[in-house]
Regions:
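Low-complexity, Ser/Thr/Pro/Gly-enriched N-terminal "stalk/linker" regions
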Residues: 1-48, 72-77
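Aromatic-lined, polymer-binding surfaces characteristic
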Residues: 43-49, 55-60, 67, 71-263
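Solvent-exposed loop and beta-edge segments used for protein-protein assembly and interaction
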Residues: 47, 100, 319, 357, ...
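Short, conserved charged micro-motifs
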Residues: 67, 275, 479-481
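Carbohydrate-active enzyme catalytic cores, enriched for enzymes
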Residues: 85-90, 129, 241-247, 252-383
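Glycine-centered tight beta-turn/hairpin loop motif at sheet-sheet or coil-to-beta transitions
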Residues: 205, 369-370, 450-454
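Low-complexity, glycine/alanine/valine/leucine- and proline-rich hydrophobic stretches
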Residues: 349-428
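Extended repeat-based interaction scaffolds and adjacent low-complexity, acidic/S/T/P-biased segments
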Residues: 400, 407-579
Length: 579
């Protein structure tokens, strides 16, 4: 895909949204893209699908792009959706309402493309829209990135001279300060989580604030920009040389929003890296996504990651949710003479292999042509779906990706890649959340319990070939545990040259583009009679299809250990290679 000129990127954005046109309702306030449901009501579902394309259209319009049909759709839809007398009215708001999330994109439009979404409206239509958006000030919000939706609404209303709440604006901006940790990192409110919501939500919205409020609130604007510059130094480690991103945390179905932090940096006039580097990263990232089967037959984005997949979804994923990814196009607002449109793509800057990220609770290692994040399992227990798989694994890799569980009854259904999986009484138990953890200069340490009466202390030490795991286990029962490596594709519609080998205390899975070998390590102090009766053995798990986020059919190499009642230490070596 040619992504060089402004027109190239504009055409790319429009190619994603053009297929939606047949699915807008008569009054244009509803966009019906599928039949699956999220936990919120149908009115919010329609509003979400309607609003999220604005994350791409608004900067397109702000940068001079013309799309007359979409302009008419969105003016008519905004008018209908906020008119209580219209049959397509989006409905009343309640506490913690999904509608508040979708108000952010509409506010984005009012601020950056008023000539399309605001100026043409009649006075009555403007009043209806403002009254609807102001409902966000009348209800409580979750203490997380959601508070910034209210910030965007209030500064949008302020910009166009309409009613807003200075008190709520100040309260939420002060609340944002309580999220800040250091080195550019925030946590996502009281959840304590650090994931893509820090990049595509908190930094994204705070930089919009910095642009809009630079004259009214120069101190905060300067602070938010400085934090973004610092954050970029570590966040760039989440990508490999081909633009692939680490599949870590929730909302992975938002796909190419993973790189949108760098897009909004450009919008805000920030260059944490040279423009050619940022252009190269954004363009490569887009290409990796757009070559995958992420669209349905009508070219509508699907819920999933590398392919349609409801198993990995959160309870808040509705058919329109994936269009959050349109945030990647924030740079379309750049003027025609900006260097971004003429420079050639550059590769990533030279990065040190290891990057301990203490505020992110991650240790990231660049292996040349793939990148792995090693995690201690720190996250909120209030999950939205597959939370253990998205935060609790030992490793998250740009090329191997991760797998999600279908059940805890069988290993092949649990798909426990990069987990120490205990098999007890017919169930699979893995690390759900850690009790203690730390990120060191050499790796990751965590203390956790998969099952009552079993405690594990895991130390992970990455190096140039892979990583070594040391598990100190104290158990009140005898059981079996499988130390699992990365899932390796065994082919789907195309042959990938898959091969497997189980030999003694190791197992290897490989194909034409990658391999993973998992081996038990017995040090010189281990006595033969300690393991002779039940030594570790290599093991290959043929997992259920559609469990890995990138590859539809995989196998996971592992080592099977017999865990004795008492205390013991097991050491496993995982070598991973991308060819």
């Amino acid at each position: 895909m040619n992504l060089h000129s402004k027109k190239d990127f504009q055409d790319c954005m429009l190619s994603i949204l053009e297929p939606l046109k047949p699915y807008y309702s008569e009054e244009k306030a509803r966009l019906t893209l599928g039949v699956t449901m999220a936990h919120y009501d149908i009115g919010a579902t329609w509003m979400e699908a309607f609003s999220r394309p604005l994350w791409g259209l608004v900067p397109f319009w702000a940068g001079g792009g013309k799309a007359p049909e979409f302009e008419k759709i969105y003016r008519k839809g905004l008018t209908a959706g906020t008119d209580e007398k219209n049959p397509e009215y989006w409905g009343e708001c309640t506490s913690f309402d999904q509608r508040f999330v979708e108000m952010a994109a509409i506010s984005y439009g009012i601020m950056f493309a008023p000539e399309v979404v605001w100026d043409p409206l009649t006075e009555e239509q403007k009043e209806n829209l403002c009254n609807y958006l102001n409902k966000i000030n009348e209800h409580p919000l979750p203490v997380c990135n959601w508070i910034l939706f209210a910030v965007l609404v209030n500064i949008a209303m302020k910009k166009v001279g309409r009613r807003y709440s200075p008190e709520m604006l100040e309260e939420y901006l002060n609340g944002l300060e309580t999220f800040y940790l250091g080195e550019g990192w925030y946590q996502d409110g009281d959840s304590g989580q650090k994931d893509y919501y820090i990049s595509f939500a908190i930094h994204f919205y705070s930089l919009i604030y910095a642009v809009i409020m630079e004259k009214d609130d120069p101190e905060r604007a300067k602070k938010y920009k400085a934090r973004a510059m610092e954050f970029a130094k570590q966040f760039i480690y989440w990508f490999d040389e081909e633009g692939e991103a680490i599949p870590f945390g929730r909302s992975l179905t938002y796909r190419f929003s993973q790189v949108s932090f760098f897009s909004v940096c450009l919008l805000a006039g920030l260059e944490p890296f040279p423009v050619p580097v940022m252009k190269g990263l954004i363009a490569r990232h887009l290409r990796t996504w757009l070559k995958r089967p992420i669209f349905d037959r009508d070219h509508v984005l699907t819920i999933g990651y590398g392919y349609p997949n409801l198993t990995m979804a959160e309870r808040y994923n509705a058919p329109g949710s994936p269009y959050w990814g349109m945030k990647v196009f924030a740079f379309l607002s750049l003027p025609d003479d900006h260097p971004f449109w003429s420079v050639e793509e550059a590769p990533l800057p030279k990065l040190a292999p290891a990057c301990p990220q203490k505020y992110a609770d991650l240790f990231v290692y660049h292996y040349g042509n793939h990148t792995t994040a090693f995690a201690p399992g720190v996250y909120s227990p209030n999950g939205h779906g597959q939370i253990v798989a998205k935060y609790g694994k030992f490793a998250y890799d740009t090329r191997f990706s991760i797998s999600v569980a279908k059940s805890c009854y069988e290993l092949h259904e649990n798909a426990p890649d990069n987990m120490l999986a205990f098999w007890i009484d017919g169930y699979v138990y893995v690390r759900r959340i850690c009790e203690e953890s730390k990120i060191t200069e050499n790796g990751v340490w965590s203390k956790w319990s998969p099952y009552p009466g079993i405690t594990v202390e895991t130390t992970i030490t990455p190096d140039a070939g892979g990583h070594t795991r040391v598990h100190k286990i104290t158990s009140e029962i005898d059981c079996v545990a499988y130390d699992c490596g990365f899932a390796v594709s065994r082919g789907d519609f195309e042959e990938v040259g898959f091969a497997e080998k189980v030999d003694g205390m190791s197992a290897q899975a490989s194909n034409e583009f990658c391999s993973c070998t998992v081996s038990a390590v017995l040090d010189e102090n281990t006595q033969v009679n300690e393991v002779a009766d039940k030594p570790p053995v290599g093991y290959m798990i043929t997992v259920d299809p559609n469990t890995n986020l990138l590859y539809t059919k995989t196998k996971i190499p592992a080592v099977k250990y017999h865990i004795r009642k008492g205390s013991q230490e097991i050491v496993t070596r995982v070598d991973a290679e991308v060819i």
